[in-house]
């Protein structure tokens, strides 16, 4: 008998995506969310939170490389990095590929995510064992609020704006992050798909221009996320994302998705999606 895992998309009512499961590896309920690990026919090992796909062996690199390397390559010398969420370790792994980095603070509210990632996704999670990585298991907004002016780059590797992640899409959280940045710092946050979540993106860019003088939206392609793409905000007090020309000499070796050409192209949006982003001028 065939077994299928079906993800009913919370933010896209009336839609679902199914994957053939060859093995259910582990299921557990943490204090914050339900965690499942499957072996799938098409995407290898799959990690879900509350029935929503987070990571698969086949395509995780496109998400992790793009949330990390776009801001890291845009900053002239990123030394101190905060990752909020991202307990699977993939974003931390990519950040550590930049030799300028001296510390990475991982602020993950759910320690169970980290523990199960060590067990089943070592290709992502083992990076979190690096001595440069500081683990902090707490609310990301509070941590940002308590660390003013500390970070060159802040990356918010969050799930969708429901449940414990909902606060990460609200104006107070973005103000807390702004206070934690150094003057030339950059923030990138998971910001949904322009195909299905125009309302979410529009709501973000209603308040973002009030906080950051420089901002933009970019995206990556990833087949296991709704619509096959996922977007990110790019926020800064000093660095215009549309004016950045990445230095090819700084690109980490062995990447599977990111390149200087992809960097520039990621900010080019279809006409309908441009309407979601309030740009000055």
Swiss-Prot record:
Pfam families named among the record's database cross-references: Spermine_synt_N, Spermine_synth
Catalytic activity as recorded in UniProt: S-adenosyl 3-(methylsulfanyl)propylamine + putrescine = S-methyl-5'-thioadenosine + spermidine + H(+)
Protein name: Polyamine aminopropyltransferase
Keyword Cytoplasm in record: yes
Active-site residues per Swiss-Prot or TrEMBL entry: 157 (proton acceptor)
Native organism: Leptospira biflexa serovar Patoc (strain Patoc 1 / ATCC 23582 / Paris)
Entry annotated with the keyword Transferase: yes
Gene3D superfamilies according to UniProt: Spermidine synthase, tetramerisation domain, Vaccinia Virus protein VP39
GO cellular component terms attached to this protein's record: cytosol
């Amino acid at each position: 008998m065939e077994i299928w895992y079906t993800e009913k998309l919370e933010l896209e009512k009336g839609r679902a995506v199914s994957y053939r499961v060859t093995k259910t590896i582990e299921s557990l309920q943490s204090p914050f969310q339900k965690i499942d690990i499957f072996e799938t026919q098409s995407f290898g090992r799959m990690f879900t939170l509350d029935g929503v796909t987070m990571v698969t062996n086949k395509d995780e690199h496109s998400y992790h490389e793009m949330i990390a390397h776009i801001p890291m390559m845009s900053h002239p010398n990123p030394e101190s990095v905060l990752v909020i969420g991202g307990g699977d370790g993939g974003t931390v792994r990519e950040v550590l590929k930049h030799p300028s980095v001296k510390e990475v603070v991982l602020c993950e509210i759910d320690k169970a995510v980290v523990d199960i990632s060590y067990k089943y996704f070592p290709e992502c999670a083992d990076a979190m064992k690096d001595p440069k990585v500081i683990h902090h298991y707490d609310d990301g907004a509070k941590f940002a609020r308590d660390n003013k002016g500390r970070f060159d780059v802040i990356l918010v590797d969050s799930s969708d704006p429901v449940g414990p992640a909902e606060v990460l899409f609200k104006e107070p959280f973005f103000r807390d992050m702004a206070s934690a940045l150094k003057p030339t710092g950059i923030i990138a946050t998971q910001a949904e798909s322009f195909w299905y979540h125009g309302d979410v993106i529009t709501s973000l860019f209603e308040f973002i221009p009030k906080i950051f003088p420089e901002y933009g939206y970019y995206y990556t392609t990833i087949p296991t996320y709704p619509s096959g793409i996922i977007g990110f905000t790019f926020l800064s007090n000093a660095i215009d994302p549309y004016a950045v020309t990445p230095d090819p000499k700084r690109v980490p070796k062995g990447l599977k998705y990111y390149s200087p050409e992809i960097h520039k192209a990621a900010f080019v949006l279809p006409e309908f999606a441009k309407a979601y982003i309030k740009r000055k001028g």
